[in-house]
Curated annotation (Swiss-Prot):
It comes from Synechococcus sp. (strain CC9902). Plays an essential role in the initiation and regulation of chromosomal replication. ATP-DnaA binds to the origin of replication (oriC) to initiate formation of the DNA replication initiation complex once per cell cycle. Binds the DnaA box (a 9 base pair repeat at the origin) and separates the double-stranded (ds)DNA. Forms a right-handed helical filament on oriC DNA; dsDNA binds to the exterior of the filament while single-stranded (ss)DNA is stabiized in the filament's interior. CDD domains: AAA (cd00009), Bac_DnaA_C (cd06571). One of its GO terms (biological process) is DNA replication initiation. InterPro entries: AAA+_ATPase, Chromosome_initiator_DnaA, Chromosome_initiator_DnaA-like, Chromosome_initiator_DnaA_CS, DnaA_C, DnaA_dom, DnaA_N_dom, DnaA_N_sf. ATP binds at residues 166, 168-170. NCBIfam families: DnaA. Residues 122-338 are annotated as: Domain III, AAA+ region. Domain I is involved in oligomerization and binding regulators, domain II is flexibile and of varying length in different bacteria, domain III forms the AAA+ region, while domain IV binds dsDNA. Its main location: cytoplasm. The gene is dnaA. Residues 339-462 are annotated as: Domain IV, binds dsDNA. This is Chromosomal replication initiator protein DnaA. Belongs to the DnaA family.
């Protein structure tokens, strides 16, 4: 009798041919098998959202495939690895406290006119799901965006995507629009910034065109509203957007909103709007980790047909950590610099251009490990192992210390680089090396030699 893992591997392979690629990659591939006994296949989803998605839409397909492969009836259940924070998901709108109980009667959204593809600003052709690199920082938001694109107005309405500047909120929003237009070319997809919504409202008031303004926005099948944080303090704009939101939501039209912060943290935002925005799913996008940044650079290089050495990708990914726009901008500058000067695309040639302030050159974690192992005469494998041999332990501590100085990795990420060490271990290592440097001339000389090889300055980032 085959094991659960064996059965799930076969089922997953069968589903890959049956489901769309985005659906398979987002919901099936990251899901594992928990157990299989007495005809029950228990699956383990990576997060609550995936679990909900599998149960509500994909469970019959999975069960059918499992039954077909095993040759007997198989019941499928889905568990989630982690619990979704209560503040991020409100399953029932009645659970949200509404402060405004004397709202005017809500208007129904008018039926959409036929034969018109788009009636608000066109979407950027580059912002599609296929060009979005999914990392741990964005997996939830990507999965939610895909679910909304496939079934608008059903699962999460509204979908509120929040995150810092340049992390991919606009990309995901517009990808939803592109996806819907591919499925339904006649869909009325409206992508609009909050500034444009406000300006349109002002013009409508000046020209006595409020009815046309309302019809225009409330006829959308899918409305994508960017930078909603700029609505703060604009009382009349908030009033009009509130009624537009209600008209669309009650008609089952999908609303997607993006902001640089959660609804509750937008100052001077009406409580009734906060409540509406929290009715669906709030999906957060964090800054990408090193691996995701490298994947983003590799993806962009492939799209632009550029051949880049891996150490250069590692260098740029380690040097620019705040957002994706900055990261891609650095790559563009590096390529332009090499093209203009005729220099090869190497870390040595582009690093001075990417670090014009002379405040120290960032390095990749792999470079730190390589140079430390070279100077301290241990192997990189030993440094990342659990061995406690004194020479290896000291080299490992030096590596953690210099990685903290020369890269933008957090303490937990440094620990991961050294074989999954805890962040407290990294903190201890840094403290130990700082103490020893003041009393051990030999160690100080070795550390300085590594610094020189890596071009790391001596300023501590603690």
């Amino acid at each position: 009798m085959e094991t659960g893992d064996e059965l799930w591997t076969k089922v997953r392979k069968g589903l890959q041919d049956k489901l769309s690629k985005p659906t398979f990659e987002t919901f099936i591939r990251p899901t594992g098998c928990s157990s299989f006994s007495n005809g029950e296949l228990k699956l383990l989803a990576p997060n609550p959202f995936t679990s909900i998605r599998l149960r509500e839409q994909l469970l019959p397909t999975i069960a059918e495939m499992a039954t077909s492969i095993s040759g007997r009836s198989v019941q499928v259940t889905v568990l989630a690895e982690t619990a979704l924070p209560k503040s991020e998901f409100v399953a029932d709108a009645a659970a949200v406290e509404l402060t405004d109980v004397s709202e005017p009667r809500r208007e129904s959204a008018p039926a959409r006119p036929s034969g018109q593809r788009r009636y608000l600003p066109a979407l950027n052709p580059r912002y599609v799901f296929g060009r979005f690199v999914v990392g741990q920082n964005s997996r939830m938001a990507h999965a939610a965006a895909l679910a909304v694109a496939e079934a608008p107005g059903r699962e999460f309405n509204p979908l509120f995507i929040c995150g810092g500047v340049g992390l991919g909120k606009t990309h995901l929003m517009q990808a939803i629009g592109h996806y819907r237009l591919e499925i339904d070319p006649g869909a009325r997809v409206a992508y609009v910034s909050t500034e444009t919504f406000t300006n349109d409202l002002i013009q409508a008031i000046r020209k006595d065109g409020m009815q046309a303004f309302r019809d225009r926005y409330r006829a959308a099948d899918l409305i994508l509203v960017d930078d909603i944080q700029f609505i703060e303090g604009k009382e009349y704009t908030q009033e009009e957007f509130f009624h537009t939101f209600n008209a669309l939501h009650e008609a089952g039209r999908q609303v997607v909103i993006a902001s640089d912060r959660p609804p509750s943290q937008i100052p001077r935002l009406q409580q009734r709007l906060i409540s509406r925005f929290q009715m669906g799913l709030i999906a957060d996008i964090q800054s990408p980790d090193l691996e995701t940044r490298m994947a983003i650079l590799q993806k962009k290089a492939e799209q632009e047909r550029m051949a880049l050495p891996r150490d250069l990708i590692q260098y740029i990914a380690g040097r620019f950590t705040s957002n994706i726009r900055e990261l891609e901008g650095a790559l563009t500058r590096a390529v332009a610099f090499a093209s203009i000067t005729g220099l090869p695309m190497t870390v040595e040639s582009v690093a001075p251009m990417l670090d014009p302030t002379g405040q120290g050159v960032a390095v990749s974690p792999q470079q730190v490990i390589e140079k430390v192992s070279e100077v301290f005469d241990v192997t990189a494998e030993e440094m990342c192992s659990s061995t406690r041999r004194r020479a290896v332990s000291q080299a490992r501590q030096v590596g953690m210390y210099l990685m903290r100085q020369g890269t933008d990795l957090s303490l937990p990420r440094i620990g991961d680089t050294f074989g999954g060490k805890d962040h407290t271990t990294v903190m201890y290592a840094i403290e130990q090396i700082e103490k020893k440097l003041a009393s051990d001339p030999k160690l100080a000389g070795q550390v300085q030699k590594v610094r020189d090889l890596l071009q790391i300055d001596s300023r501590s980032k603690r």
